[in-house]
Amino acid sequence: MTLDPDQTGEIPLGPVTEWTATVVGVHRLREDTTVVRLIGEFVPFAPGQSVEVRTPQHPNMVRRLYSALPPSLDGKLEFHVRAVPGGWCSGSLVTDTRAGDEWRITAPAGWLAVHEAAAELILVADGVGLAPLRALLLDLTRRPHPPRTHLFVGARYPRDLYAADMLALLGNELPWLTIVPVVDSDTDPAHPDPWYDQCRVDIGFHPEELVPGPLAAAVSRFAPLSHQQILVCGGTTAVETTVDILVDTGTPLENIRYEAF
């Protein structure tokens, strides 16, 4: 699946520039997932875009991450990082990031953007692919008439819905937003996750609200989506499967924008 940038509405980038930001908060939410908050120079990216980051632990390695916040003049950034099995750089970001670290940020890129004329929006997030879609949601709150939006959030197990409390609050506060949590299994694995046990909160999704996965199948139950704009972000397999099944069930490819990592 390949989209021509001219057809996707990719946001043109300016000359290469580097900005710096300092880590002010590190929140380990799961054994493999960390939320990193930074404040620094204003980074001129668009909501939904990713940036390249270099960290003091690996100054010569580049990692592309999505901001979970829209750009702000006060320089606030938030990244959701999940350790990839066998990926020691992502694992180090989860375990070794500390407050006070200075990150170098370059190269905003991407085309996950909401059409101004969109009346109905379908957002599909696999894992930490939620980050750019959350940034877009927060940006939509600035519109006088946001589009009716369904956000599908996919995870393997219920405890992998790492932002369940935040999503439940958003769903309650925004009348135009419907959250659809999707899990491959409705039962958590037997082995414990100490980080989940430490930060578990009462706010979240009730078991009866969880939709059986996989994510692509859950989204396809609403197909064909002939009039909606669809944005998909997450792991390569989940994204490709979702786009393929949507197209196969009658959704026009031109309605879909997607990015995978």
Label each PLM-derived region with a short phrase:
Residues L130-R142:
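Histidine-anchored nucleotide/phosphate-binding helix
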Residues G48, G129, G235:
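Short, conserved phosphate/pyrophosphate- and ester-handling motifs at nucleotide-, phospho-/glycolipid
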Residues D4-D101, A155-Y157, V182-D186:
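Ferredoxin-reductase
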Residues L121-A131:
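Short, glycine-rich nucleotide/cofactor-binding loops
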Residues P15-T17, F152, Y157-F261:
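Reductase modules of NAD(P)H-dependent flavoproteins
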Residues E120-I122, H150, Q229:
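Structural motif
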